[in-house]
Amino acid sequence: MSFELPALPYAKDALAPHISAETIEYHYGKHHQTYVTNLNNLIKGTAFEGKSLEEIIRSSEGGVFNNAAQVWNHTFYWNCLAPNAGGEPTGKVAEAIAASFGSFADFKAQFTDAAIKNFGSGWTWLVKNSDGKLAIVSTSNAGTPLTTDATPLLTVDVWEHAYYIDYRNARPGYLEHFWALVNWEFVAKNLAA
């Protein structure tokens, strides 16, 4: 079984003006596609062939892990975003954020700060720990919460390819616009899982 690039849940220009169609074309169409292609080439004829993406991530290392995790991380990231989204969460997500961080404003400030300070390439995540509390976790390179007992709820990609076309080296500007795209319905589904 080979993996395919999952379809975006919206048109390539749907996240503008926050994330341009050009960024999506390169980020999704080139970077994400390359991880899929590399993974398929790396697993061909190995014990990983025929396994799910999650199984590969949890049992591999090196190039296989890096490409599998990047395929999963990117697919998750695209679903964390939506046109006409953003704002503040409601319902159980709002309650969980308030219980863990005090307020949405405090959470947003802490998440943004963690993402800005995530050195180099990586991801910043909102996760639900096994005790039910929410936490902000930053991972480097292809790191993913799937290798832990935490449940990923939300992520932001802080690899430069995620924002360089639109924001150059200004990661804070990218993070400011990220909040206008957060798909809280997707976060709520992850929290309920």
Curated annotation (Swiss-Prot):
SUPFAM superfamilies: Fe,Mn superoxide dismutase (SOD), C-terminal domain, Fe,Mn superoxide dismutase (SOD), N-terminal domain. Induction: The transcript is subject to small RNA (sRNA)-mediated degradation; sRNA RyhB-binding at the ribosome-binding site (RBS) both blocks translation and induces mRNA cleavage by the RNA degradosome over 350 bases downstream. RhyB blocks translation even in the absence of the RNA degradosome. Deletion of fur derepresses rhyB expression, and leads to less expression of this gene. Binds 1 Fe cation per subunit. It is an enzyme of class 1 (oxidoreductase). Its cofactor is Fe cation. Belongs to the iron/manganese superoxide dismutase family. This is Superoxide dismutase [Fe]. It comes from Escherichia coli (strain K12).
